[in-house]
Amino acid sequence: MATKHILIKMKQSSPLQKGLITAGLMILASLFSLYILKNPVESYFQIIIYVIFSVGIVWSMFSYSKSVTDKKSFSNYFSIGFKTFIVVALLMTVFAFTYFSLNPEFRDNKIAENSRKLILEGSHLQAEIEENAAQLKKMFIPMMLSAAIFRYLIIGAIITLIAAGFLSKKNYKVL
């Protein structure tokens, strides 16, 4: 019996491993969308990225539900999901930093679009518009990274809460 327990433990991958796999799939899907399909960063393809993210979290928690441990409480499920989505959020933030650093034209297009809007408003001086563009250029990457981190943390927490609530029900039977 002890040997079976050890083999099952060895076959299970950790939330870290599942987070790495999930983030890898998300990065591959992002690269496919950006470079093969030529979608803009803010396309509807992002929904697929979030579905992969959600499935990765649930996969990690569901795998834990099949483990032989008796400690299957809401907090344990949440802990597994949390560890998974934190790894994904970290790697996706690194990916976003890398992408935006290597593709400054995305930043420049956003700044130009913002400047056009300010010109059309007609209530800004040219010097104000240029100063605004310079400020946006300085804070663009930190702003985009903050938004990415916040998005992944919020979505990850929501998915984890829902899945932990479902999986921790006493009458829930794992297939």
Report the location of each language-model feature.
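Short, charged juxtamembrane terminal tails flanking transmembrane helices
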Residues: A2-I8, S168-L175
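Alpha-helical transmembrane segments of multi-pass membrane proteins
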Residues: S13, Q17-I21, S79-L91
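Functional transmembrane-helix hotspots
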Residues: V94-S123
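Alpha-helical transmembrane segments of multipass membrane proteins
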Residues: L25-S33, F53-I57, V88-A96, I155, ...
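Transmembrane alpha-helical insertion/packing segments
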Residues: A2-S63
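Short membrane-interface loop/juxtamembrane segments of multi-pass integral membrane proteins
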Residues: L118-F140
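Individual transmembrane alpha-helix segments
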Residues: A134-A157
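Membrane-helix interface/capping segments
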Residues: F62-Y77
